[in-house]
Amino acid sequence: MMKEKAKKYLSVAIDWLLYLSVAFLCVSAVWLLSQVFLFSSFSVPTDSMTPAIVPGDCVLVNKVLRGGRIFNLNDAFDHKPLEIARLRGTGKFRRNEVLVFNFPYPERWDSIGFDVMRYYVKRCIALPGDTVEIRNAHYRVRGYRGELGNIDSQNSLARYMRSERNRDEMIKGGSFKAYPLDSVTGWTVQEFGPLYLPARGDTVRLDRHRYAVYRNLIEWEQRKKLTAHNGCFYLDGSEINYYVFTHDYYFMGGDNCYNSQDSRYWGLLPEEYIVGKATRIWTSKNRVTDEIRWDRVFKKIE
């Protein structure tokens, strides 16, 4: 009799263990799929997006808008060339939206790479097909009359750079000259562009100027070296005069214009590198006192 009861209890315990194991696996699978395809969370360590996002904020990122990404994690960790696929999304990214993306220059400034563990959060200033400029530290997109980025910060930077002494300090600190750091453009964070953002299918005729601003994009798309010699351009040794882009590109800017490593310095961002749109601050912790900033919890990012 006792043996039968023991067997019964053991059978019930095993059943419950199996049920709990299956439930745990199901919850884990749902959580993992949600992280890949629906949403994810990122902690922000710097002040480059102040005041919209401050150090210690944890932002919730919507991946549904443009679609979740699929790529080989092993290749990403080994820094091998990646094929990144994106699921069909519900919409498109817009100017002034805050986006999270993989930083495209983790190793070298003259070559696009991919670091699966290094994420940036910036505001989208310009879209594929836009022509972006910076005039007196203020962002402009041709044909668009709305404000772009943090206007107060741009006003402050413009006033700061009126002083020749301040400009000299920025030059010495390496924060005045802008992408592509080439004498053919001479662009700075004060006066930049115009720069056309290629969209998939766009054709450009190569010249010295376009070579300077698009070389790294073409090399990333083709995985071949683009060189210039005596006014001619060679892709992996074969002369080319025109190039058709196969990807879309974005121009990103931090709200804190004084301290933001963004497209002003490193150039254009391939769409495949974008994780998604930062929608809310789901929690925030003061890094000095370790206290929760309750006034920022679940705050909408605008």
Where are these regions (language model features)?
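Cytochrome P450 fold signature focused on the C-terminal beta-domain
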Residues: 40-41, 126
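Residue-level signal for pocket-adjacent positions within structured domains
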Residues: 37-39, 292
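N-terminal signal-anchor transmembrane helix
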Residues: 41-52
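Soluble "head" domains of membrane/secretory-pathway proteins
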Residues: 3-13, 50-302
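Hydrophobic membrane-insertion alpha-helices, especially the h-region
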Residues: 18-37
